[in-house]
């Protein structure tokens, strides 16, 4: 009920201003009696993924809490994990505003944020300050002004800094809003990146005395042969997990709507079937050797279960969470519990 009222107010505002207001409000009320407006206790529905045990299969996708400012608040809502980021080595402002657009009739969002964040050192401070014991994944990327050929170094810098504080690390090479980034999904550039990250992981595991799994986040705009090559590279480099998918550059299901011609990645309900299709293709190629988090367009428990049936082990929500609120978390967890009996 409270979320519906808050949503009505925020949907009258500019989307980015509403986002910043929400983050500020959650940050100031976390771990206080005021979190009663959004906190909910969910029944346990544990899931094993990448060698870790998560309290339930529903996570918050990267992009909502880029700087890790509201980890405890999102944990209180019942998320089984919170993926923060995308974070880059140095702070950067992202693309010019406006850069975030609602397509309300389609329950969709277009964004061209461009990895706006306060930098990895700021994120690490927030990870250290979190009190809830939430399972936190850290989504890492490269700075816009780092040439793609040197992008690997940005990922290694971020990985080294967040490693001691992350439950897992997600490698984002699939945002459409950083020029050239998606080229890292192909051929030698991909193999070189994954191999370097695995070598770094081995070094950091020995140094810190703990193994932090790493997962690759891929785009939905891939041909079947491209998905197959990514799967082969994941297996060859012994990656721990995959996250499918990021936002799409297609505009299926939104043509003619206000804001549908804006540049950027489309998320929300229109992405659902495409991302589920990619999950199925990826799962078929991986043959159980690398587990998958399914994300993209989940707006109901049925959408989430479809992704699990397609081959995902866990799911993440973002746009659906904006449109539905914390009730969507509970709805999916309850459906998962019934399915798992």
UniProtKB/Swiss-Prot annotation:
Active site: residue positions: 175
GO molecular function, one term: dihydroorotate dehydrogenase (quinone) activity
Function recorded in the entry: Catalyzes the conversion of dihydroorotate to orotate with quinone as electron acceptor.
Record PANTHER family: DIHYDROOROTATE DEHYDROGENASE (QUINONE), MITOCHONDRIAL (PTHR48109:SF4), DIHYDROOROTATE DEHYDROGENASE (QUINONE), MITOCHONDRIAL-RELATED (PTHR48109)
Record-listed E.C. numbers: 1.3.5.2
A GO cellular component entry from the record: plasma membrane
EC main group: oxidoreductase
Residues noted as binding FMN in the record, renumbered to the chain: 62-66, 86, 139, 172, 217, 245, 268, 297, 318-319
Chief location of this protein within or outside the cell: membrane
Residues noted as binding substrate in the record, renumbered to the chain: 66, 111-115, 172, 177, 246-247
Cofactor: FMN
InterPro entries (alphabetical): Aldolase_TIM, DHO_dehydrogenase, Dihydroorotate_DH_1_2, Dihydroorotate_DH_2, Dihydroorotate_DH_cat, Dihydroorotate_DH_CS
Membrane topology: Peripheral membrane protein
Signal sequence interval, chain numbering: none
Gene: pyrD
Protein family according to the UniProt entry: Belongs to the dihydroorotate dehydrogenase family. Type 2 subfamily.
Lineage of the organism: Bacteria, Pseudomonadati, Pseudomonadota, Gammaproteobacteria, Alteromonadales
GO biological process, one term: 'de novo' UMP biosynthetic process
Catalytic activity of the protein: (S)-dihydroorotate + a quinone = orotate + a quinol
Binding partners and assembly: Monomer.
Compartments reported by the entry: Cell membrane
Keywords: Cell membrane, Flavoprotein, FMN, Membrane, Oxidoreductase, Pyrimidine biosynthesis
Name assigned to this protein: Dihydroorotate dehydrogenase (quinone)
Pathway: Pyrimidine metabolism; UMP biosynthesis via de novo pathway; orotate from (S)-dihydroorotate (quinone route): step 1/1
PROSITE patterns linked to this entry: DHODEHASE_1, DHODEHASE_2
Cofactor note: Binds 1 FMN per subunit.
